[in-house]
Amino acid sequence: MNSCDKQQLKTTAAKVRLGIIEGVYNAKSGHPGGSLSAADIFTYLYFKELHIDPQNPKDPDRDRFVLSKGHCAPGLYAALAQRGYFSVDELKKLRYIGAMLQGHPDMKGTPGIDMSSGSLGQGISAAAGMALAGKIDNKDYRVYSLLGDGEIEEGQVWEAAMFASHNNLDNLCLIVDFNGLQIDGPVSEVAGPEPIDKKFEAFGFDVQTIDGHDFDAIEAAFAHAKTVKSKPSVIIAKTVKGKGVSYMENQVGWHGTAPNKEQYETAMQELTAALHELEGC
């Protein structure tokens, strides 16, 4: 990746993080930690990887994206706003009654949402179904789904993984946001799903493990996934929960807590300073 592209992605990711904090603060509820950890992944997907058109969000030939860890919708919404699906002003109305952006993705109410999600474990099943439909219809689109590391404790994840492998869904790419923390504590202590890579390999997936905040690594992983034949792919992205906001990083308490006014102002100052530094390069 050239330096100009990388700089632009970092700048956009900083704006996505600002949007996450803005939305969750105004809603007085939501899930900032996992949204921030996935911000770089959302950014790369919507600005480099996905074949999409914000002016034609229902294009039958578009790539599909399913946010299986639907509670991290603030990150997805912030990326969609930056990509032009709707105004960034909508982020300030997150979770408001009747607003476009609800607490979990709603495919009927929000442009750019391919699947309603939030019940953990179900998104991957929907994504696998979309991928199979693409095969049946002889379509070239690809399907992507972002899962949480705590989410993969759900049995339905592995039923869908078995289905995807059995049907040779090489047009399906999963991303696991492995930030190591879930609502009840460290993932390793709650159910201990590791080694995740070996599990997916046993289920017939092509597996890569990367730094989920390194755009060069993200680019290389998605490029490789598109070369894989006759099997689905999974990218295990090692990330930092709360990435970008110093007091939120690696703190389980920020899984599903909104910042108060003082915390909001601190977060916005940090993220704005980071953005200005990037824009000054």
Segment roles from a protein language model:
Residues 215-281:
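Glycine/aspartate-rich loop-and-adjacent alpha/beta segment that forms the canonical ThDP
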Residues 77-78, 106, 156-158, 184-188, ...:
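Short acidic, glycine/serine/threonine-rich loops at helix termini
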Residues 1-16:
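N-terminal hydrophobic or amphipathic helices/low-complexity stretches enriched
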Residues 71-72, 76, 179-180, 214, ...:
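Glycine-rich beta-alpha junction loops
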Residues 66, 173, 209, 234-236:
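Structured core elements
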Residues 112, 116-119, 124-227:
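Thiamine diphosphate
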Residues 13-29, 177-179:
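N-terminal capping segment at the start of a domain
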Residues 20-24, 35-159, 165-166:
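Cofactor-binding active-site loop characterized by glycine-rich and histidine/acidic residues
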